[in-house]
UniProtKB/Swiss-Prot annotation:
Protein name as it appears in the record: Phosphatidylinositol 5-phosphate 4-kinase type-2 gamma
Catalysed reaction equations from the record: a 1,2-diacyl-sn-glycero-3-phospho-(1D-myo-inositol-5-phosphate) + ATP = a 1,2-diacyl-sn-glycero-3-phospho-(1D-myo-inositol-4,5-bisphosphate) + ADP + H(+); 1,2-dihexadecanoyl-sn-glycero-3-phospho-(1D-myo-inositol-5-phosphate) + ATP = 1,2-dihexadecanoyl-sn-glycero-3-phospho-(1D-myo-inositol-4,5-bisphosphate) + ADP + H(+); 1,2-dihexadecanoyl-sn-glycero-3-phospho-(1D-myo-inositol-5-phosphate) + GTP = 1,2-dihexadecanoyl-sn-glycero-3-phospho-(1D-myo-inositol-4,5-bisphosphate) + GDP + H(+)
Gene Ontology BP, a term: negative regulation of insulin receptor signaling pathway
Subcellular location: Endoplasmic reticulum; Cytoplasm
The enzyme's E.C. designation: 2.7.1.149
InterPro entries membership: PInositol-4-P-4/5-kinase_C_sf, PInositol-4-P-4/5-kinase_core, PInositol-4-P-5-kinase_N, PInositol-4/5-P-5/4-kinase
The species this protein was found in: Pongo abelii
Sites bearing Phosphoserine, chain numbering: 26, 349
PTM description: Phosphorylated, phosphorylation is induced by EGF.
Record-linked PROSITE patterns: PIPK
Subunit comment: Interacts with PIP5K1A; the interaction inhibits PIP5K1A kinase activity.
Amino acid sequence: MASSSVPPATVSAATTGPGPGFGFASKTKKKHFVQQEVKVFRAADPLVGVFLWGVAHSINELSQVPPPVMLLPDDFKASSKIKVNNHLFHRENLPSHFKFKEYCPQVFRNLRDRFGIDDQDYLVSLTRNPPSESEGSDGRFLICYDRTLVIKEVSSEDIADMHSNLSNYHQYIVKCHGNTLLPQFLGMYRVSVDNEDSYMLVMRNMFSHRLPVHRKYDLKGSLVSREASDKEKVKELPTLKGMDFLNKNQKVYIGEDEKKIFLEKLKRDVEFLVQLKIMDYSLLLGIHDIIRGSEPEEEGPVREDESEVDGDCSLTGPPALVGSYGTSPEGIGGYIHSHRPLGPGEFESFIDVHAIRSAEGAPQKEVYFMGLIDILTQYDAKKKAAHAAKTVKHGAGAEISTVHPEQYAKRFLDFITNIFA
């Protein structure tokens, strides 16, 4: 961790509102010089460093303003921006020039609240220690130090799709009181370093922050080309698919009440996705083996990023943030330390919101983590063309993934209903 005095920097801050298309027209813009003492995160990756700095700056800005009584249409078109130009800023801390943009800050603030996540906990979980790289199917995938949040690098098209559906998503979360299998979207950002834009989505981790997953499946319902590759299968924790699930005779052993609640929630969520003409989503299934998880593990080597960080390492924005982390300085997962110690296979349902324990008498003592992922693909001209091409290749009756949203939903629900014992 480094504490450095930041030399005078030109900082341009802007609050923006709606504009044509996906762009935004600036409503207000001010430029001023600041001299400030800032604790700066020593991130090896400039992109990550700027992202974490920007989140800290954003949360600090939001903390100065009370939440609105109700969200207005303009809140779904708004954004906040900051531009930093500082030729003297040391490269090992942050780049000398960068821009940071948060989309719809009040909307995501409201969503975090509805998902039971305090802004200060959100900040600490993201920034107290460096996030670690995790294996993702496409794009960059980071997981925060307490494993409660994931940061996914997405395309500008994904951001545009997310932006266009955000109002519907928010209304749905309000209607279901946050009780959903959909991804819990908590923040949407753009980071500009070296004249390159990167887009980040922050979500709650579908898996546990403390119970390791021993097997995982990405289930769509389609069986064509839905088997993990040989290259994937040799990984320590491969992402298996529908054919693998069937070939291994895998089943999910939960009680009838839990199964009923889960399927009702799933059907409601899928109906919502059909209304938005969304398809190609999956059920992510993670399985924690309680017996295996209770066995002592050999200590592995200390990760390089852990060995380089002391306990007080934090990235903060303006000085008001330094050392002011509210009443739960351990972040989202920190609540766990104020309660009784958890035994093998035990979890706190308000943190591990997607966890379901196997039923009494089940052949395997397991904890299952199940939620919907990849919900940004809409049925557009590209999907129609892909559907036509695959129909020619595999035949009209083949279980291909690119079908109409209604067909996709029916096939998906039929498949998921049958994964239970």
